[in-house]
Amino acid sequence: TLESPEAAGVEMSLSPDGSRLVVTWPVVKGAGGYEFTLYNVDDFEKPIVIGVEKEVIDGCSAVREVEADTKYMAAIRTLGNEQYNNKEAQTASEIPYSTLAPTDATIESGDISAWLVANPIPADKIGQEYTIDLVGGREYIVSDVIDFGNQQVTIRGSKVNHAKIKMVGNASFLTNKGFKLKFADVDCAEMTAATLLGTSTTPDASSQVASGEYVVSTPIMLQGCNVTNLGKKLFYDMNKVKYCIDYLGFDDCNIQMLQSDVLVHAAKSSIIRMD
């Protein structure tokens, strides 16, 4: 009886544009081919087949289309070869792969703003994207303004079980470098701040261009979020600094507005792209 390819020998890599996953595995001598399946395992209890299930491959590689921020698992099983009286492998090798950005820190619960005060971004991470995970289904609050300044930060919940965030008082997220909030349910009923998202009142001097604007070249965005009870602005540049924002985005979001004022307000700034 043959064995399936060893998981340690399987290589998985993204195409340059990130749209396809290329999976290669070592040859199993005497094999009559391989059975390949790729699963989306964001919800491990309910895997979703990507492409052809149990595709028979006469070779040692397979390609599947993939998406960002997704967990996958490849299953590869060696098939038998009657010519050599080799029987197929009884089980498949299972190899996990994720297109999620690596986690730098995890907040288990509680006040996100207080946690960030107690756990500042490490000096060796300044200038790099810093990803903070929230635990799926857990409840959090933001009790004060969080100004990330010139640090590019992503706060990320779970795609299949959103983190629950309650914005309280002067709570808001400000940045001059780019900020993403992903996969969270955000309740703004108790938020008194002028905006949920905004630009920092202290710009990054190195980002200033000849026109006098300060360029925010990385996205400011919500992705996969449900925002409820929003009685203030969704985005506001705080009317302090003249920014040029390359991209302001709201991807796969539901936003409940409880006001008829301007939702996105760039008083001094310009926004190149918004969707």
What are these regions (language model features)?
Residues 18, 139-154, 164-217:
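Extracellular beta-strand-rich solenoid/capping regions of secreted or surface-exposed proteins
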Residues 28-52:
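Extracellular low-complexity, O-glycosylation-prone stalks/linkers
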Residues 43-52, 88-121:
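Right-handed parallel beta-helix/beta-solenoid
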Residues 178-190, 216-231, 243-262, 268-275:
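Right-handed parallel beta-helix
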Residues 1-30, 68, 83-100:
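Pro/Thr/Ser/Gly-rich low-complexity, intrinsically disordered linker/stalk tracts
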Residues 108-153, 158-170:
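N-terminal extracellular ligand-recognition/capping segment immediately after the signal peptide
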Residues 83-84, 143-144, 166-171, 189-197, ...:
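Short glycine/acidic-rich loop motifs that flank beta-strands on beta-rich extracellular proteins
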Residues 62-86:
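Beta-strand-rich modules
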